[in-house]
Amino acid sequence: SWRFNIIEEAAIGGRGGYEHFKDNGTDIFFLAQWFPRMVAYTDYAGWQHKAFLGRGEFTLEFGDYDVAITVPKGHIVSATGELKNAKQVLTAKQRQRLAQTNAAQPTFIVTPEEALANEAKQHQGQRTWRFSAKKVRDFAWASSEKFIWDAMLHEQPGAEYDQVLALS
């Protein structure tokens, strides 16, 4: 079994933690490099065992991830990969906006007005968001009831995928 305590980012800095907003009691959680994994092995140096010193990156292998993240019901989750259960976590209107995303201009999936209303509402229960990512170095995610979400298709002719969906 394994546990990971999420620490307030202001206390330690780094690549993960949470930020608490005292004015309304909400939080933003953001996590990168948050789970244990084997170190990388290279044919020229063997096992990579250098300590992480904060300026740089770990040596990581590429991998495939299928991740379920359970958060308070009002949270919007941003994560590496493709959202697999939009029907369970987004409203019908938000799913429609996501489906209509194009390369001409950004589209709000969660509007600023919806984010403000969501932030003010008292939510009960939890919701699980599911993501899948193929051939990536790491899996990172963020979660908050404060999030505004927009999306836009990015054209990349000649690449393995002609279009990718950019989310922020």
Descriptions of predicted regions:
Residues 1-26, 115-130:
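A surface-exposed beta-strand-loop module
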Residues 51:
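Loop-rich catalytic cores of soluble enzymes, especially ATP-dependent carboxylate-amine ligases
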Residues 17-38, 86-88:
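Short edge-strand/loop segments of extracellular domains
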Residues 40-42, 46-47, 55-168:
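Hydrophobic helix-coil surface modules that form long, contiguous segments used
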Residues 4-8, 39, 43-44:
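Enriched for extracellular/lumenal, surface-exposed ectodomains of secreted and cell-surface proteins
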